[in-house]
Amino acid sequence: MADSAVPCSLGPSTRASSTHRDATGTKQTRALKRGDASKRQAELEAAIQRKVEFERKAVRIVEQLLEENITEEFLKECGMFITPAHYSDVVDERSIIKLCGYPLCQKKLGVIPKQKYRISTKTNKVYDITERKSFCSNFCYRASKFFETQIPKTPVWVREEERPPDFQLLKKGQSGSSGEVVQFFRDAVTAADVDGSGALEAQCDPASSSSWSERASDEEEQGFVSSLLPGNRPKAVDTRPQPHTKSSIMRKKAAQNVDSKEGEQTVSEVTEQLDNCRLDSQEKVATCKRPLKKESTQISSPGPLCDRFNTSAISEHKHGVSQVTLVGISKKSAEHFRSKFAKSNPGSGSASGLVHVRPEVAKANLLRVLSDTLTEWKTEETLKFLYGQNHDSVCLKPSSASEPDEELDEDDISCDPGSCGPALSQAQNTLDATLPFRGSDTAIKPLPSYESLKKETEMLNLRVREFYRGRCVLNEDTTKSQDSKESVLQRDPSFPLIDSSSQNQIRRRIVLEKLSKVLPGLLGPLQITMGDIYTELKNLIQTFRLSNRNIIHKPVEWTLIAVVLLLLLTPILGIQKHSPKNVVFTQFIATLLTELHLKFEDLEKLTMIFRTSC
């Protein structure tokens, strides 16, 4: 019992001491937590102040970069204390104050375009010029982008322990870009693109490996579309570098094996052809000559595939196997030239290669078109206007003017029917039997005059009109006795056609407009103006027989037509043949004909058309 009573008496004091110790430990823990919290808060405040200082420094650098005189060393030093976002702010702020966005450039911005995109006809691409508007040139845009990509993207307050980057600046003379390329879609690579010859040319050409920004350095744009004239047109392939796959590598190896086998076969074939060729047989030499030249290029180039393709392409171009001409014209013009060349060279087939019109053929076509046009234009009224009423005595007969003088041969000498043989006399008898008359006994009737034919035509028209009107019936006796003027008065008055509705008036106006564009350059040597010749020219054109086909000509053809008409009108204008004005004009025309690869005899043939009777 005693042993059990002692611990019971000590229990309350022990509990009190343990409670005191717990309270003391709690106070110490709270004190430590308060100290740690204040320390952490101080560290956090220091870190925030440090971040703020770095941000303030970056903002001050942005403000300094808005100035005009910025050196390369200062720009490189600033790159360590700013981020790409700060640099884009520099570009925006400089563009707002009308300065170039590149800090090293001191130029002012000119007229800023309002559009968002720009279409390049040279590279056939669409560029987004939203960022490009902030720069004065493509070089500044690319140099700015080149520097921006080197700026670290990490926060500025953690770069103290990092190694500063070595900034590089774009040098002058390197090309720039027009903006970011807008990718609408991406074409899938097909087997035809891989096997096409265009891909080989793209791989062989070292200039094609340059980036799109270097190819867009030229500021000038081409206003035309390149087109290919008849020939073997290569396929349009995608020249962008494609990733090398396993299948493509296998295809390349197979192609190399095939090329090596073809090379061995080519060597054997050439040796056989050389054995067959002999100096005494010209035909064999001619047959062996062309394939020998064609295949020698394949033997002499055992190098890479690119060199073999280039040499074979050059040899094929020389021998006309695959000749293609690149012309800077539009697609519509290319189709027009194809049709023109096809008409001028009807005998050339599809295998003729390059379409080339010889100067002789072009000259003959030009003279033929002008001769047909002037012949269709000429009327009886034209000859009366140029030479008066007695133009028959001035003009030549069509037979004497059109047919050249030929020398008489022995066969052309007339002979008697008996001496020429029975065959000729029999042929003449059969010819006389088929004719409605025989011999020259029949009297030749005189041709009616132009005035009588004109009067009869007017009377016939009058009779037809009166008959359909039903007003009166004219007998033949009365119509013959009446005068033409009185018959015209009996008809109802008719209003003339409106100029806009008359086809002849429209055609005459078109011809006058075309000639008015060409004549001022030809009237200088004659020292006369367009007003001095306009009345006579208009009266001459009114006598022409114009249609919807003979008034369509090229500028060169209109020039020659104007020269012909001017030569016809010089006597009417009072310019003497041997006057100083006419001599200068003749020299000018001779120079013009030389430029057109024509002769003065060709011009004489054209003017001779108006010196022959209809």
UniProtKB/Swiss-Prot annotation:
Reaction it catalyzes: O-phospho-L-seryl-[protein] + H2O = L-seryl-[protein] + phosphate; O-phospho-L-threonyl-[protein] + H2O = L-threonyl-[protein] + phosphate
Modified residues (Phosphoserine): S9, S217, S481
One GO CC annotation: nucleus
Keyword Hydrolase: yes
Residues recorded as bearing N-acetylalanine in the entry: A2
Keywords for this protein: Acetylation, Coiled coil, Cytoplasm, Hydrolase, Metal-binding, Nucleus, Phosphoprotein, Protein phosphatase, Transcription, Transcription regulation, Zinc, Zinc-finger
Domain of life: Eukaryota
Signal peptide (residue range): none
Keyword Nucleus: yes
One Pfam family per UniProt: RPAP2_Rtr1
InterPro entries assigned: Rtr1/RPAP2 (IPR039693), Rtr1/RPAP2_dom (IPR007308), Rtr1/RPAP2_sf (IPR038534)
Enzyme Commission number(s) of this protein: 3.1.3.16
Similarity-based family: Belongs to the RPAP2 family.
Functional summary from the UniProt entry: Protein phosphatase that displays CTD phosphatase activity and regulates transcription of snRNA genes. Recognizes and binds phosphorylated 'Ser-7' of the C-terminal heptapeptide repeat domain (CTD) of the largest RNA polymerase II subunit POLR2A, and mediates dephosphorylation of 'Ser-5' of the CTD, thereby promoting transcription of snRNA genes. Downstream of EIF2AK3/PERK, dephosphorylates ERN1, a sensor for the endoplasmic reticulum unfolded protein response (UPR), to abort failed ER-stress adaptation and trigger apoptosis.
Protein name stated in the entry: Putative RNA polymerase II subunit B1 CTD phosphatase Rpap2
Gene that produces this protein: Rpap2
